[in-house]
Regions:
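Short, aromatic/His-centered strand-loop micro-motif at the edge of beta-sheets
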Residues: 20-42
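Short, conserved, surface-exposed binding loops centered on an aromatic residue
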Residues: 3-7, 32-37, 48-50
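Glycan-recognition/cleft segments
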Residues: 1-19, 75-83
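Short loop/turn segments at connectors of secondary-structure elements within structured domains
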Residues: 10, 51-54, 112
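Carbohydrate-binding surfaces in secreted/extracellular proteins
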Residues: 37, 42-76
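Short beta-strand segments enriched in hydrophobic/aromatic residues
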Residues: 18, 47-49, 61, 94, ...
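Short, surface-exposed beta-strand/loop "edge" segments at domain boundaries and coil↔beta transitions
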Residues: 21-27, 65-69, 96-104
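Ligand-recognition surfaces built from glycine- and aromatic
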Residues: 34-35, 77-121
């Protein structure tokens, strides 16, 4: 999961997390979210789906070519047992907190996609 995250200890960051059913989420890469705000970024993401899968991602700021986040290929289980298909999602997803307790902290956000492509390799 690629997630924008905020807490009092680490501030705002973009995290790449590995999530195994029944286990806690582990952050495997992170970057300061401030570097992303108001900027176009180019993302190259490669995923091999399967129980013996892998994941890698590079995010580069377009205006100066600075790499903001890079995760080298990681072996990981990229398939849930008994699943019959794959449903990738791109967009803004929010957790409102228990009983909507964080709702007042949310602000309007916008995400724009350009030159979007998906390839089966």
């Amino acid at each position: 999961t690629l997630t924008a995250y905020s807490n009092s200890k680490s501030g705002q960051q973009l995290r790449v997390c590995s999530d195994k059913r029944g286990e806690s989420t582990t952050t495997i890469a992170s970057a300061d979210l401030a570097d992303f705000l108001g900027n176009w970024v180019e993302v190259e993401e490669k995923a091999r789906f399967g129980e013996d899968g892998s994941y890698e991602v590079t995010i580069m700021r377009v205006k100066d070519g600075k790499v903001l986040l890079k995760l080298d290929p990681q072996k990981m289980d990229m398939w849930r047992t008994d699943c019959t298909g794959l449903r990738p999602k791109w967009g803004i997803y929010r957790y409102l907190g228990e009983n909507r307790s964080w709702q007042d902290q949310l602000r309007d956000e916008e995400i724009r996609f350009a030159d979007f492509s998906i390839k089966k390799l």
